[in-house]
Amino acid sequence: MRKPIIAGNWKMNKTLSEAQSFAEAVKNAVPSNDVVDAVIGSPALFLAPLAWNLKDSEVKLAAQNCYWENAGAFTGENSPAAIADLGVDYVIIGHSERREYFHETDEDINKKAKAIFANGMTPIFCCGETLETYEAGKTAEWIEGQITKGLVGLSNEQVASMVIAYEPIWAIGTGKSADANIADEICGVVRSTVEKLYGKEVSEAVRIQYGGSVKPENIAEYMAKENVDGALVGGASLEADSFLALLDAVK
């Protein structure tokens, strides 16, 4: 039985005071980690104070990105070793916004995944297709390619422990969402690709999220599906009440 994981991706939103107010509102209200993993994907600026705010709570922290080197002349980048030292559990990598706006490649994302594991954290590895790819019927082929290139060189144990988030680009922040059956089908493609590469035991262990205009009103439909183990949520994770409602719908 795979434990559900609900991760909020705040993207480039909130001030420090807003982030800390959110943390105070949710830290004693989230369900137990025995039931569901509750994760906040915060801007890097807030990770240190939030780690302090949330140190005795069930909420886990995710960075939204990191570099693949621990130190060096990489102005403006965030060291995975430094992120881990703050007590961060997860790092989101491969998000479509990083791929599109910052030209990150599958090879870049693969190096980041290895660095994240090397520093004792867990990647939330994002994959997803454009509307053009979806309408051309090439979603499965596209997703298989992203996963195959993005996970190369990782061990069975590492892949089994990671989180893979399927986010159709055409559903991110648009108000549109892939219906639950489509989400289940493509999350099934993710799982079958992992099985081809790493075997059935690993594919049955890896947790797969759906992301793309998920909100409290529709999350239960997705979570009822066999291949959907959680959600990577953008806008609906920005308000404490909404984030808690997402978790309540899952527990």
Curated annotation (Swiss-Prot):
Example of a GO MF term: triose-phosphate isomerase activity
Presence of keyword Transport: no
SUPFAM superfamilies from the UniProt entry: Triosephosphate isomerase (TIM) (SSF51351)
Keyword Ribosomal protein appears in the UniProt entry: no
UniProt keyword annotations, A-Z: Cytoplasm, Gluconeogenesis, Glycolysis, Isomerase
A single cellular component GO annotation: cytosol
UniProt subcellular location: Cytoplasm
Known pathway: Carbohydrate biosynthesis; gluconeogenesis; Carbohydrate degradation; glycolysis; D-glyceraldehyde 3-phosphate from glycerone phosphate: step 1/1
Catalysed reaction equations from the record: D-glyceraldehyde 3-phosphate = dihydroxyacetone phosphate
Amino acids binding substrate: 9-11, 173, 213, 234-235
Record: active site: 95 (electrophile), 167 (proton acceptor)
Top-rank EC class of the record's enzyme: isomerase
GO annotation (BP), single: glycolytic process
Quaternary structure and partners: Homodimer.
Similarity-based family: Belongs to the triosephosphate isomerase family.
HAMAP family registered for this protein in UniProt: TIM_B
NCBIfam families named in the record: tim (TIGR00419)
Biological function: Involved in the gluconeogenesis. Catalyzes stereospecifically the conversion of dihydroxyacetone phosphate (DHAP) to D-glyceraldehyde-3-phosphate (G3P).
Protein name, entry field: Triosephosphate isomerase
Organism: Enterococcus faecalis (strain ATCC 700802 / V583)
Gene that specifies this protein: tpiA
